[in-house]
Amino acid sequence: MSKSHAAYIDYALRRTTNMPVEMMGTDVVRLKDYQHFVARVFLGLDSMHSLLLFHETGVGKTMTTVYILKHLKDIYTNWAIILLVKKALIEDPWMNTILRYAPEITKDCIFINYDDQNFRNKFFTNIKTINSKSRICVIIDECHNFISKSLIKEDGKIRPTRSVYNFLSKTIALKNHKMICLSATPIVNSVQEFTMLVNLLRPGSLQHQSLFENKRLVNEKELVSKLGGLCSYIVNNEFSIFDDVEGSASFAKKTVLMRYVNMSKKQEEIYQKAKLTEIKTGISSFRILRRMATTFTFDSFPERQNRDPGEYAQEIATLYNDFKRSLRDREFSKSALDTFKKGELLGGDASAADISLFTELKEKSAKFIDVCLGILASHGKCLVFEPFVNQSGIEILLLYFKVFGISNIEFSSRTKDTRIKAVAEFNQESNTNGECIKTCVFSSSGGEGISFFSINDIFILDMTWNEASLRQIVGRAIRLNSHVLTPPERRYVNVHFIMARLSNGMPTVDEDLFEIIQSKSKEFVQLFRVFKHTSLEWIHANEKDFSPIDNESGWKTLVSRAIDLSSKKNITNKLIEGTNIWYSNSNRLMSINRGFKGVDGRVYDVDGNYLHDMPDNPVIKIHDGKLIYIF
């Protein structure tokens, strides 16, 4: 049915031929062609009630949305605009963008923070105050967070955000309102999020049905047929976050580096205690204690179970203060720092004080030592992602920075009042090369919504639970024109994943999480393909054989059809002769996978999914006694 969707897209574009490409307020900006296109379609089809902007980080989702909001009155006089956003993003980018380019709509805007404990009450209170003659346009920024907060917990408890989700799914189309969801990563943790998002945008279209069978999408054709026009898809980088990507005129080159560091004997001892504690307390599935242990360890492992919280907190504070005092008036000599900046380690001619300090710091954290060395050797500015703030996280890392003489700013939950200003200073043209501020260390608070310019190295100290979060983190630094001020030879970003290792060769929590991410991505890639093939851009570019229409009366019927996955595609099991192989998608062998090569030269993954044909002259590397094909 994509031809039918194409006819409506064509109709919307014909209706909006004269829509200006510039947006003017106190400042003027000219929209990119893809921004203008999606705005014209969404505004040109009044009965298009909802749309997902699946745009990668840095291509201007906020700008596109503000343009749409500015032109809402082209189709109806009275609008109330409700923006559901994270608190950290209200001022920048949202208010700043609106004030610059569409100040006239500020009086119509209501900002509500969906992280607020009273979010539900605030939302419905504001809904009641809206004039009955007004139409409503709801914006959900970083909608994957909103969806995640609306999922029913494993214990069956319904979360407060769910009532807002239910209201929007029932009301937007019924009352002729509009809604835009924004995300660079619309699916983060589970396939259920896809179902939730689809049913928010197209209520009731995707009932409780199994989307996958043996990790294969049951009926992709049915989904694409029924979900046409669901989203706008602007994703220039469709590669895995672990793949290298060449640069372009607008985007910096990305190179991924896996930095494996060996934990000290002391760290390994604490790590094993953390693992045992997780098993005893039943929290091993979260791996928090082990993740913290791979990052930094005190001289002892403080037990938390069956203890007064105040007593436990006091012990942590004492350990921190003891460590801080041990570094008082200590720092590396200029000679040592010059050595580190060359990318070298201390030699036999180094001072006893430098060697002693380095040894003490490395014993407690091989990761922090590695990051500090990497920052000093970097030719430009750096970002460091550390999700933990206290105990073994940012609070400790900053002590390392001080000893290594690394200038820095912090973007985390404990710098709420200063972090926006600090990032602005970090991004100033005068600091393009990191002359004033070398590094920004950020927690999950900085994973979304902010932009960094002229970054050359990102260090990721802790694996997240999903590839989407990693994309958000890396996307802070690789954005449209983010390196325009950087010298041409430095328009690159090295992404360093710091992975801890045990001396006995057993996998660490870092390696476990890496495997989890790869497992999830198999299903997500198929769903992202559905988004791509149902997008306005794909349909407009690929469906040309349609009959023009002169009204939009059939749009609602077209997009309200239920999806039926009961008639599954016929999947025939075949016995194929061939050999088992190992393969990798990276020249640096960041991930090595089992596969199968048939006698006909076709290559399959471990689940039997066809990948591609074996090249005539394949690239082969030897690793740990295995022949690894590089595809």
Curated annotation (Swiss-Prot):
Swiss-Prot/TrEMBL GO biological process terms: DNA-templated transcription
Effect of residue 331 to K: In strain: Garcia-1966
Chain location of the short sequence motif DEXH box per the record: 141-144
Domain named Helicase C-terminal: residues: 367-532
Compartment(s): Virion
Keywords of the record: ATP-binding, DNA-binding, Hydrolase, Late protein, Nucleotide-binding, Transcription, Virion
Cleaved signal peptide residues: none
Entry EC no(s): 3.6.1.15
PROSITE patterns: HELICASE_ATP_BIND_1, HELICASE_CTER
Disulfide bonds: none
GO cellular component, one term: virion component
Catalytic activity annotation: a ribonucleoside 5'-triphosphate + H2O = a ribonucleoside 5'-diphosphate + phosphate + H(+)
Enzymatic class: hydrolase
Subunit record text: Monomer. Interacts (via C-terminus) with RAP94/OPG109 (via N-terminus). Interacts with the cap-specific mRNA (nucleoside-2'-O-)-methyltransferase OPG102.
Stated family: Belongs to the helicase family. NPH I subfamily.
Name used for this protein in its record: Nucleoside triphosphatase I
Source organism of this protein record: Variola virus
